[in-house]
Regions:
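Von Willebrand factor
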Residues: 36-55
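Short acidic, Gly/Ser-rich segments with clustered Asp/Glu that frequently serve as metal-coordination loops
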Residues: 12-18
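Active-site loop/turn elements of alpha/beta-hydrolase fold enzymes
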Residues: 11, 48-50, 150
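Active-site-adjacent betaalpha module
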Residues: 1-5, 31-39, 64-183
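…and closely analogous acidic/polar surface helices at protein-protein or active-site interfaces
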Residues: 19-36
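Acidic-leg catalytic submotif of subtilisin-like serine proteases
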Residues: 5-12
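Short, flexible, mixed-charge acidic loops at enzyme active sites
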Residues: 56-63
Length: 183
């Protein structure tokens, strides 16, 4: 029997604050989390985070390099906190990544395999960032994948649409939160 984990990726205060065009997003994501908790689905969180001074970041990295010299996504940054509307429950695993994909710089794969998890349900911000990268990484690691299309957000609605309708279906089942929670 397959064991499943719902991954909530990069739903951190600073990131959520940039995506306020869909006020129902967090409540929809909360419904997915509640559905997982009510079933036999592990809920895991992935968050971007660095040590003070960002020693893990190369100045050549166009995404993370500009953070060097700031407190961005360190323990001193309140914006690095997972949004309280969808915060982890006691015992939920939280994986801190150092790059875009959920597997980069984490022990996520080891933890999933050690728990016998074979199926992943992916949510998060952004569709063209952590979700896309994690779909590719997880597919290459032979996980069975589901992406909750409205459990993901992107700054570009057209990019989100193309990814969830034309790209992800090649490697994952794509469902809405309502479809997943009613299955």
């Amino acid at each position: 029997m397959a064991k499943t984990a719902l991954l909530v990726m990069d739903v951190q205060r600073a990131i959520v604050s940039r995506f306020d065009s869909d006020p129902a997003y967090l409540s929809r994501l909360g419904r997915a989390i509640a559905h997982a908790r009510a079933g036999d689905v592990t809920v895991g969180y992935v968050a971007v985070g660095f040590r003070a001074g960002h020693p893990e970041v190369s100045p050549a990295n166009p995404t993370f390099g500009p953070m060097i010299g700031t407190d961005a996504f360190t323990a001193a940054d309140p914006g690095a906190e997972i949004h309280p509307s969808v915060a982890p429950a006691p015992g939920d695993p939280v994986f801190t990544k150092k790059r875009v994909g959920a597997f980069s710089g984490t022990d996520l794969d080891l933890a999933l395999r050690s728990s016998g998890i074979t199926d992943l349900v992916l949510t998060g911000i952004s569709t063209s960032g952590c979700v896309l990268t994690t779909v590719r990484q997880a597919f290459d690691l032979d996980y069975r994948l589901t992406v909750l299309s409205d459990g993901c957000r992107d700054a570009d609605d057209e990019v989100h649409r193309v990814l969830t309708t034309a790209v992800f279906p090649r490697q994952a089942t794509v469902l809405t939160v309502a479809e997943w929670t009613s299955a």
